[in-house]
Amino acid sequence: MPSDSKKPTIIYPCLWDYRVIMTTKDTSTLKELLETYQRPFKLEFKNTSKNAKFYSFNVSMEVSNESERNEIFQKISQLDKVVQTL
């Protein structure tokens, strides 16, 4: 098996970035979700699509382990106005 197919080694806790694409500029539900983790986070507006149909944001926050990182990803992805989470 080639070495490039291995999972990268991530040392936790670490700062993790999520790119969130939404159909609204209103990030209140996203902020509410992130606040439930009771730790600092950074939420930055990044881009608007050409026709202003989508808005992208960058979320940075510390995650304790892979399970928590994946849980946050899933919860963000399930928000009503979220189209995609990367």
From Swiss-Prot:
Family membership noted in the UniProt record: To C.jejuni CJ0253.
Entry protein name: Uncharacterized protein HP_0495
InterPro entries referenced in this protein's UniProt entry, alphabetically: UPF0250_YbeD-like (IPR007454), YbeD-like_sf (IPR027471)
Source domain of life: Bacteria
Gene3D superfamilies in the record: 3.30.70.260
Organism: Helicobacter pylori (strain ATCC 700392 / 26695)
Coiled coil: none
Pfam family name, one: DUF493
